[in-house]
Amino acid sequence: MINYNDSEVGVYHPICENALNKTLRLLGQERNYRVLHHRYTGSLEMDFVIENITTHKYLCVIEVKRTPAAVNSTRYQFQAMSYVQSNVGLTEKPYYILTNLERAILFRYDSARQRTYQQMLQPGLSIIGDFQSFADENALCDALSIYFKDTINTILADD
C-alpha cells in the first residue's frame, strides 16, 4: 500500500488521476471535461487541472502532496492558490484543491481575500481515510472519487 516515502509523481499522481477520471465518468462530465497532468502556467507546473474540452478553460486546479502536514501547510496552500492567480483568462471557475489523497481542502480564489484560510470552503479539511484503512489502491481511488464527485459537483453548481 502507499506510504509517505513513495514518489509523489510515480505513485500519488496516478492514483489521483484515476480518481479524477472516474469522477468525471460518475458525474457524466467526461465529454465536457478532461483531466490534464502537469500543465504549465508560465514557468509553474500544476499537478492536475480539469479542463473544459470546448473552451480549454480550467474548472479547477488540483495540487498533490505526500503528507497530511503538507495539506495543512500555508506554504503549499499558497502554492496552489498561485496557480489560480496565474491562470487569469484561463479559468472557468476559480477553484483549487490541495490533497495528499488521505486529506483534502477545497478553496475558492478571491482576490479580495489574500490569505488562503479566507478562501477555504466548508467543511475545511476533508478526511478521505488513512492509507492503512484501505485494502488496496483501488479502494483508496474509490474513496477519493467520492470526495472529488461531491467537490466537483459543488464547483459545477457555482454560477
Language model region names:
Residues M1-Y95, R103-D159:
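A short, conserved, highly charged catalytic patch centered on acidic carboxylates
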